[in-house]
Amino acid sequence: MAKKTITRIAKINLLGGQAKPGPALASVGINMGEFTKQFNEKTKDKQGEMIPCVITAYNDKSFDFILKTTPVSILLKQAAKLEKGAKNAKTIVGKITMAKAKEIAQYKLVDLNANTVEAALKMVLGTAKQMGIEVIE
């Protein structure tokens, strides 16, 4: 039996429970119908959330995929009830509490390059600052 070799690793963002075959998946070179079925099954509890996904495609058209947590920027916009962040970091467009920022840091800890909640919180606070979201005590 031939050994499977990796042909491509792709990172794409899809809406939870709503993946459809399309150009983003076609370029990866996998069975799109099977992928969308498996992806939608795994993300049915996260309907409408943006889910980053890392797809590993193999030479025999098989694949593996890993689901990541929702991006910090989207979580911050949801917490501050915003459509989008500020055009520049000096313009304040919304506010969230420190408790909410800690909650986001705790949720994102598994995917961030941080070992502690405090380090993850610094990353979340930096993202909030760049988006024009003020963090209040």
UniProtKB/Swiss-Prot annotation:
Description of post-translational modifications: One or more lysine residues are methylated.
Keyword rRNA-binding: yes
GO biological process, any: translation
A single GO cellular-component term on record: cytosolic large ribosomal subunit
InterPro entries: Ribosomal_uL11, Ribosomal_uL11_bac-typ, Ribosomal_uL11_C, Ribosomal_uL11_C_sf, Ribosomal_uL11_CS, Ribosomal_uL11_N, Ribosomal_uL11_N_sf
Keywords: Methylation, Ribonucleoprotein, Ribosomal protein, RNA-binding, rRNA-binding
Gene Ontology MF term list: large ribosomal subunit rRNA binding; structural constituent of ribosome
Annotated S-S bridges: none
Transmembrane segments: none
PROSITE patterns listed in its UniProt record: RIBOSOMAL_L11
Pfam families: Ribosomal_L11 (PF00298), Ribosomal_L11_N (PF03946)
Task of the protein: Forms part of the ribosomal stalk which helps the ribosome interact with GTP-bound translation factors.
Cross-referenced NCBIfam families: L11_bact (TIGR01632)
Similarity annotation: Belongs to the universal ribosomal protein uL11 family.
Subunit structure: Part of the ribosomal stalk of the 50S ribosomal subunit. Interacts with L10 and the large rRNA to form the base of the stalk. L10 forms an elongated spine to which L12 dimers bind in a sequential fashion forming a multimeric L10(L12)X complex.
Protein name: Large ribosomal subunit protein uL11
Organism of this sequence: Mycoplasma pneumoniae (strain ATCC 29342 / M129 / Subtype 1) (Mycoplasmoides pneumoniae)
Lineage of producing organism: Bacteria, Bacillati, Mycoplasmatota, Mycoplasmoidales, Mycoplasmoidaceae
Gene field: rplK
